[in-house]
Amino acid sequence: MKHLHRFFSSDASGGIILIIAAILAMMMANSGATSGWYHDFLETPVQLRVGSLEINKNMLLWINDALMAVFFLLVGLEVKRELMQGSLASLRQAAFPVIAAIGGMIVPALLYLAFNYADPITREGWAIPAATDIAFALGVLALLGSRVPLALKIFLMALAIIDDLGAIIIIALFYTNDLSMASLGVAAVAIAVLAVLNLCGVRRTGVYILVGVVLWTAVLKSGVHATLAGVIVGFFIPLKEKHGRSTAKRLEHVLHPWVAYLILPLFAFANAGVSLQGVTLDGLTSILPLGIIAGLLIGKPLGISLFCWLALRLKLAHLPEGTTYQQIMAVGILCGIGFTMSIFIASLAFGSVDPELINWAKLGILVGSISSAVIGYSWLRVRLRPSV
């Protein structure tokens, strides 16, 4: 029991469980004995009905859209705390992850197009390597435990959130045919209610969560990625202490173990099961997977490092306190873990054209993401000295 307690008390434990869940998913998806069970589990229909409102999705989408909204709620709470009281409190510090995220979206997209511009079909996947999977990136960073400076973790979180917001905007503008304006209107009203609650100093967490559920449902029905609702709710929950207690910090403390030991491992298990059946070297070296691999493995760190360097040279931003430029470069490599958001964009880009392209895109995403995870982790392990 002592060893078990020590494991769960470790900062790296959540990342270890997430990696185990991802490996288990890969093994099950590629085993004849378990692949059927694995995919049946993900396709299990789950229906929620309240009056005339009905949400009918399979298990995979409930995990990605509902449970991950809770993860994004936690991320929103942590980033808000750092924006108001921590390492992102000044304008120049806050500008740094914004500039990094812009570079991390532009350069991978351009590199992908360098491989695929001549093909009008695969060209549509230009946004695939522009995305970062914040859950897996943070999971890999967590493997390094307490030696990771808090400012570096917050930088990655802020960068990845901005990256995700950029991906959501790209999806809405380029990959979504039908946006429900009525649902977006309901979402706008819910956001206004959250703002009023915050301004009035309401501190009951349940009230914010209730409005958050309405917001999540509206965003889901609108056609925009529903996890965005979690970030929005997190930003409106009061951080300022009253009678020595902070609503946001208290909720952050409650959510952390649930996210680290249940939601993220379940997310990894549901999304990492990519089938390798039919994979060939010729297919892997075709322009589609090559463009994705290059975009994630080279474009992401190059874009983030280049734009960060320019921001520092032009004195537009400061390095996060206690970090080095080499560590920022390593985080840029971790941002090449595109995974689920990249797979989602690939399904939108090629789903109605040629489903076979989705499989090759997934392979490119898998190779690029795993390579980014291994190289980024190794570089950071060298650059970060264990705390004493």
UniProtKB/Swiss-Prot annotation:
It is found in: Cell inner membrane. GO terms for biological process: regulation of pH. The chain crosses the membrane at residues 12-31, 59-80, 97-116, 123-130, 155-176, 181-200, 205-222, 224-236, 254-272, 287-310, 340-350, 358-380. Residues 1-11, 81-96, 131-154, 201-204, 237-253, 311-339, 381-388 are cytoplasmic. It is a multi-pass membrane protein. The keyword Transport applies. Residues 32-58, 117-122, 177-180, 223, 273-286, 351-357 are periplasmic. One of its GO terms (molecular function) is sodium:proton antiporter activity. One of its GO terms (cellular component) is plasma membrane. The keyword Iron does not apply. It catalyses: Na(+)(in) + 2 H(+)(out) = Na(+)(out) + 2 H(+)(in). Keywords: Antiport, Cell inner membrane, Cell membrane, Ion transport, Membrane, Sodium, Sodium transport, Transmembrane, Transmembrane helix, Transport. Its main location: membrane. InterPro entries: Na/H_antiporter_dom_sf (IPR023171), NhaA (IPR004670). It holds the Pfam family Na_H_antiport_1. Coiled coil: none annotated. Na(+)/H(+) antiporter that extrudes sodium in exchange for external protons. HAMAP family: NhaA. Belongs to the NhaA Na(+)/H(+) (TC 2.A.33) antiporter family. This is Na(+)/H(+) antiporter NhaA. It comes from Shigella dysenteriae serotype 1 (strain Sd197).
